Curated annotation (Swiss-Prot):
Matches recorded under PANTHER family: DIPHOSPHOINOSITOL PENTAKISPHOSPHATE KINASE (PTHR12750), INOSITOL HEXAKISPHOSPHATE AND DIPHOSPHOINOSITOL-PENTAKISPHOSPHATE KINASE 1 (PTHR12750:SF11)
Protein name: Inositol hexakisphosphate and diphosphoinositol-pentakisphosphate kinase 1
Species, as recorded: Mus musculus (Mouse)
GO cellular component: cytosol; plasma membrane
Family named by the database record: Belongs to the histidine acid phosphatase family. VIP1 subfamily.
Amino acid sequence: MWSLTANEDESTTAHFFLGAGDEGLGTCGIGMRTEESDSELLEDEEDEVPPEPQIIVGICAMTKKSKSKPMTQILERLCRFDYLTVVILGEDVILNEPVENWPSCHCLISFHSKGFPLDKAVAYSKLRNPFLINDLAMQYYIQDRREVYRILQEEGIDLPRYAVLNRDPACPEECSLIEGEDQVEVNGAVFPKPFVEKPVSAEDHNVYIYYPSSAGGGSQRLFRKIGSRSSVYSPESSVRKTGSYIYEEFMPTDGTDVKVYTVGPDYAHAEARKSPALDGKVERDSEGKEVRYPVMLTAMEKLVARKVCVAFKQTVCGFDLLRANGHSFVCDVNGFSFVKNSMKYYDDCAKILGNTIMRELAPQFQIPWSIPTEAEDIPIVPTTSGTMMELRCVIAIIRHGDRTPKQKMKMEVTHPRFFALFEKHGGYKTGKLKLKRPEQLQEVLDITRLLLAELEKEPEAEIEEKTGKLEQLKSVLEMYGHFSGINRKVQLTYYPHGVKASNEGQDLQREPLAPSLLLVLKWGGELTPDGRVQAEELGRAFRCMYPGGQGDYAGFPGCGLLRLHSTFRHDLKIYASDEGRVQMTAAAFAKGLLALEGELTPILVQMVKSANMNGLLDSDSDSLSSCQHRVKARLHHILQQDAPFGPEDYDQLAPTGSTSLLNSMSVIQNPVKVCDQVFALIENLTHQIRERMQDPSSVDLQLYHSETLELMLQRWSKLERDFRQKSGRYDISKIPDIYDCVKYDVQHNGSLGLQGTAELLRLSKALADVVIPQEYGISREEKVEIAVGFCLPLLRKILLDLQRTHEDESVNKLHPLYSRGVLSPGRHVRTRLYFTSESHVHSLLSVFRYGGLLDETQDAQWQRALAYLSAISELNYMTQIVIMLYEDNTRDPLSEERFHVELHFSPGVKGVEEGSAPAGCGFRPASSENEEMKTDPGSIENLCPGKASDEPDRALQTSPQPVEGTGLPRRSPLIRNRKAGSMEVLSETSSSRPGGYRLFSSSRPPTEMKQSGLGSQCTGLFSTTVLGGSSSAPNLQDYARTHGKKLPPASLKHRDELLFVPAVKRFSVSFAKHPTNGFEGCSMVPTIYPLETLHNALSLRQVSEFLTKVCQRHTDAHAQASAALFDSMHNHQASDSPFSPPRTLHSPPLQLRHRSEKPPWYSSGPSSTVSSAGPSSPTTVDGNSHFGFSDQSSVNIHMTEEKQGFGLLQETPGDGTRELHIERQQELVEPAQSPQELPVEICPSGSQGVTKVSQTCQEVPDIVQPCHNIHEEIGQPQQEVPDISQLLLKDHDTTTNTCHLCQASQLSQKVCEEICQLCQDNHEESNQLCQEVSVKLGRMVHGFPVNVDSTAQETLMEIGRPTQEIPEDPYQEFSVKVGVLAQKAPAISELSQDIPEADKPSQELSEETELQAQEVSEEIDQESEVVDELPPEAIS
């Protein structure tokens, strides 16, 4: 009746067809037409185009809902499917017409809201039998909170403890209420205040929260938002006496609620908002909308989203989550609900709904439609070596962004009040104390004021200098009129025999004194607005490292990552040290990377993990190692000589022959003379500032970042005082501060026009280029020793990250065709970002340069890379070291070529002097595009800047365009003007992308270009010295794609001209004057150097063995015992077998699901077959049922990541490394508990399918890996589960692999029993699994502890015992969650790899439990990685 009779061009305008009785409504909204206007249009076109079948999608809801903005936006997009026609039933029709008169439709989207006749909708669905998006009968249940809670409970979904009070005369036994002063007893269940009282009707939003008298009593009354209020406080403390209610525990959520919106079981969007219970004030933005911000769901929460969607049979469903005490609880299910104001969500939702409808209904109409198989579904990309590989892991270590100058003051304090403060905050436990919180700084300020008051009364000559410092301490702490822990920090270090010679002017050693404290005050160093822009833009550029973004979503840079991320196939963790500038840099980067909006604070809270309590990214620069003291003394001695540098000095100061160092020394010539010049220039500068302050016109002058001339003068005056000591000698340690300050003023305060700053910058930079890198060691050996002292924990964590990726995903995978078709969530990318300070970046680079990664005499590529690094004079803000791990599934699983590692580097922000960095090696695909590259696949171009452009037969030297890569997102006209459902779009965009960033030479056939370049282009992130970007980081730059498409291969010359930009601007993050730049307001923000490839032909084995060797070599005798656990594990990992996937378990061929009678919520495939709708979890096709279960390691990986990444990282604090003082540290070295011993005892009991394992440690991984094979069969979809296993796996290499075999023996039986019990329908398969995976593998599975409480907890605790840095709490939470997961063991049944039936109903169980498995892993990952529960003493 309502079908289209012509094939209209619907790509530009969405068509809405309105049912009778709503003509007046048909004219509103973009693209909406009345029935009459459409009829005329159809008549006009009827003769031109033969009729095509149409699927009619009916919208049956109240007008307020069907015409809402979200619905309109989604329906507009839905109409872009060629064969879908939308019909909106008018409210008059719904309310007044009998259902027989309602328009017929093939698919019905109908949902209840106030006043909606649900009965009529149910009758209509029975009459017409349309395909229902949201089940109608279940909507009756959603209106009753009692039924909602009952269903949630049946599904095993966590919800707060509750009791129902039914005031029903027919059921007096359910109406027992005893109210006390601070508690209420409902039907025998006692609820102490605070508790929540909810009406049983879901339509009644008058929810009350009752507070205990100790907190003041009263209640908070929540209601539907009225204006700017959502609740009000009432002094009434008595519960309501009429009506039926649900009483439940109040969950402490830290003031935020999470609202989750599902679109099918495999997609969920989550937003956090201020809890209405907090103060009742609705936070609104400038447009009057409630402030919400997107959040990441944990794996367990993703599982909950799926289960809610399936249990209530609502494809589109919203529900509320409470995050409390490390758990997530569902407290409300709202039914049909859309996200407001999220274009991304509208795109995704329409695509998922459209694909769901097409999948179910298209076959009936013989409509040609198939599941789009896009390259984005698997992160396969061309690497820089030209081969097609799957991106598995990205590890980046990034320095913070542009900051204000750091300032520091040291003073010795001996007053008892300081000692009392030191003791109060636990300083004696570690000998050090950091005070950052406002209340702590207030205590310091109070003591300072008190001492100054005493000094005024009793001045003593001998402490005059201290008086000045106390005054400065007071003035700094009083700055801004309030405390912000990010801006200032006080450190106290205990010296039992008095502080040694101070760095602030005293050259002679003092005699040993009574105990004293060294107080170090640090201020400044805040991230500037420019620093935020740099970080956010770099985050945007980093998106382009990730694959995908084809088809309808190729409209803006980096959307492949966003799709990967929103569909839960991106395992992202961001770590930052505890410095405010570092944390804010990480938050700004995350904002750009994930296209988040709003302020940085909520992003920081939600996304950035603080790694400060374990030394992972922090370093105590005030406690130098003996090696650093020696180096510093030697450096100061050489630079105090008033004579030109001679050959001896060059030998002493630059034994490594660093090009940049030699250049700087040639500029300096005589260090003392240069210091004299620098001092004179500083004096001149302070004189100019004082003069400027006398100028009346400069009284209210505001400098950059709200600095005043007075503060600027203080900054320079302090440097002037400190640089030249009383003895006339210069304090070389102040040179970096001088360079820091002058660089800041030249860049940000250039408008002042101060004289001499350019010369001061030139000279101080030359000095700093000697002092800064040489403070980290002069000889190669010193550099490595100091470097490992700084970043040993980080090295261990990087090693862990690489091996975890390798271990949990290295088994044989599904054929890419199947995986693409089902959007396998196992195809995920693991990203670990570490934001830190200059010391860690210098140190890590030193390890790679001087640690012996490769022999430069044997490797020409590495030799040129070292030459490039040698020419780098400064590791500026936003310096990046990036490690990318690829897997080549075409290689033999045991081959070393299976895993491919690339090492990239960028020196960060460009200096004030353009071109101050050398021409890099380029982000080079050493692909086989010509014979020369074939013969030397590992080579890189010379450092000669002109070489690339002189070789036209190589990939073109194209430079990124700022507008598309790092500017604001733009949609591609090619894509957006076509229908989203059109397969032609997919093929066209695929073939039109000539290799993305790789603009190939004309000799390359277009077909080959298509195969090699799965991504499109992004600007700036990758060096164009050799070619215009990374093919291992396909980007999404429309410019290259759309223009490139129009140019035939023969016109590459013109394309080269079209895309070429001068090299100096190739990462134009903020060249505001560039006409194409998207960031117009940041003209002062320097651009960032692109990534250069240091090496693109490393194997995982090489890198892992190198990192292991470095960590072992620098482990001192004291830490040897505890390090044995870690190191032995890595020795195992370095053996032949572990670095390639082990023996594989063959899984039956997968079958794509045929159209089924099942509703969409039972769909085993993903809701959307396009990247945007990728599964949130392991829900692939029914083929999932072929997956076998994994060994315990899969569960424990995440534990281990933390334990090793955080706990064991601290094991070896020798040779300058920082020792983490944690209680129970001794337990680390107790040999009795070391899993190292376990392999010998337990290996013989390895699982079936694994070759009999000998007692050699090397065999252990073989157990793991077959387990992984089994695991991966289910574990692939559970990409997160492997994380957990590796986490514990890394800690106790054998604990997971063998400990489980041993310790979990008693659990094995239970595994089988509960599996069988909980999976009655799959009883046979459950037993089959237990037999097949073997009891022993089942025991390894005990990482999903079957006993929810004690057993699981005990087992996990046993495993966790050797690394106590992480306290028990996370384990307990983990064990409960994992236990819950294990109870849902249908996963295990379905995961049995021998189950051939792919379409059985048990399929759903499989998917859910795979998800559960995944959930646990990520849950653990997140909980344990945060490590916030570390004991306070560990935090110092």
